[in-house]
Amino acid sequence: MNVSSGLAFVPLAMTPTYCATKAAIHSYTQSLRYQLKSTKVEVVELIPPYVQTTLMGDQMAEDPRAMPLKEFIDEVMSILQSQPDAKEICVKNVYPLRFAAESGQEKYESFFQQLNDSMHG
């Protein structure tokens, strides 16, 4: 299981390296899954949203905009149990990021702007 991020799909300008590496993990995971499709190896990608952890300090762990860690873990475990063949594990909180590009360029750009503005406010 590889762990990318919702920010692999809509980058946060204040953390460009983090977002770029998570996008690379997403790309790598897709390629690896394709390369191993004729084997018994399952390649799964976990795509977390913004989660309350101490990754960037205590402030992040208490940020009300972030998903509580226990909620995230509970939802991930539920998905793993109910969808054992899932190639991507996406909790509902990450859907806006994961599927932003599918909304079209104009909506994507608006979402990108709103996301980045909200993190600076």
Task: Kindly give the residue locations of the regions a language model identified.
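Rossmann-fold scaffold of SDR-type NAD(P)-dependent oxidoreductases
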Residues: N2
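Residue(s) in the substrate-gating loop at a strand-loop-helix junction
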Residues: S5
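Active-site-adjacent segment of SDR/Rossmann-fold oxidoreductases
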Residues: V10, S31-E42
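Active-site loop immediately N-terminal to the catalytic Tyr-X3-Lys motif
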Residues: L12-P16
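Active-site helix of classical SDR
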Residues: T21
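C-terminal helical subdomain
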Residues: E45, A61-Q105
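Short, flexible catalytic-loop segment of classical short-chain dehydrogenase/reductase
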Residues: P48-D58
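Non-catalytic terminal and boundary segments that flank Rossmann-like NAD(P)-dependent oxidoreductase
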Residues: K107-G121
